[in-house]
Amino acid sequence: MQQKIGTLRLALTFAGCFLGAGYVSGQELWQYFGAFGARGLLGLALAVVLLGGTGVLLLRLSARTGIETMDALIVRADIPWLRTAVGVLTAALLFGVVCIMAAGIGALGNQMLGLPVWLGAAIACVLIAAAAYFGLGGMVSVFTVAVPCMIVAALVIAGIRLHRTELTAAAFAAGDTNPMLGSWATSAVNYAAYNFFATVGILAPLTRHLKKPGTAVCGTVLGCVLLLAVALGVLAALATSPESTRAPLPMLDLACRLGAAGVVYAVLLFLGMFGTSVSSLVAVLTYAGQKSAWLAGHRTVLLLVLTAAAFAGSLFGFGDLIGTVYPVYGYLGMAAMLLVAEHAVHARRAGNNRAATGD
């Protein structure tokens, strides 16, 4: 990456870390925010502010220390076992994403084709494993094109729905919420924390490529505005269609109610989920190979075991997995956020001390 990153590019990259298939499917946004009614909108604002603040903090910490690896940014002290634990937890989160995306494809096949969910998930796992086995991780860049297309499609569908259906205050009544998320406030913090934990390794290496120091703040703020705009559009549209919120893929259900838009959205969702799952599985395989020579030499066996485990995990269902895996990592992510904040304070004090002594 030789080209310097400006404000707009950083904003798109920052937002792209969160605007995945789970986000624009509507399931994730509804569980974390929509289910809490009007207060959920306050939670959304809080989550975006936290993501923006921690994003800037992370970029500045990386710039100040020169550290780009996730484990060293989170764990300041050189404690090998603790840094390894962070790496293992990250790999486990990526594996959880594979399970969630496989379940999502299974739900998609059920909604669009009437296939049993388990069969759709099984087919998805076979395709994901094949892509990983034949070294097609690089082709994931092709599938990532589906993400911005999904964002545009989601906003268009939301706009059409809102144009046809009047949005009233009653539409934002609170519904059934996930007990693991507690109140709207804890749900917001949890959402910000698990997303922060999942993207530390993506954002940190960008620091040395920024055009100027101020780009970190401006780009992150603009990215937050984009996140907020998409989320508000999705939540407002779903608020007018309570029946869609009960579907595994709420925005797909809403799109199908608008006619042919459902087919287009289904294809985009499939590409987005498939790309996310392949890249996540390849990352897990790569990490395992780096940590163990035996696993590196038995990559195929490891791939088969992970695929079987991912299929088993997918049977818990797309909505239930999002409502369980993400909250668990959200609480772990809270610890990661605090550790990064502590690291940032320590680095700033160390810099001030060096400046005072003239070193």
Please name every model-derived segment.
Residues 104-109, 116-123, 131-162, 322-340:
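Membrane-interface loop-to-helix entry segments
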Residues 46-71, 233-237, 241:
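Juxtamembrane transmembrane-helix boundary signature
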Residues 2-5, 35-39, 65-93, 111-117, ...:
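Transmembrane-helix boundary/entry motifs in multi-pass membrane transporters
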Residues 71-77, 101-121, 208-228, 280-304:
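Helix-loop-helix connectors at the membrane interface of multi-pass transporters/channels
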Residues 177, 238-260:
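Membrane-interface interhelical connector segments
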Residues 5-24, 43, 91-94, 98, ...:
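Hydrophobic, membrane-embedded alpha-helices of multi-pass small-molecule transporters
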Residues 3-8, 32-59, 217-219, 224-229, ...:
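Extracellular loop-to-transmembrane helix junctions
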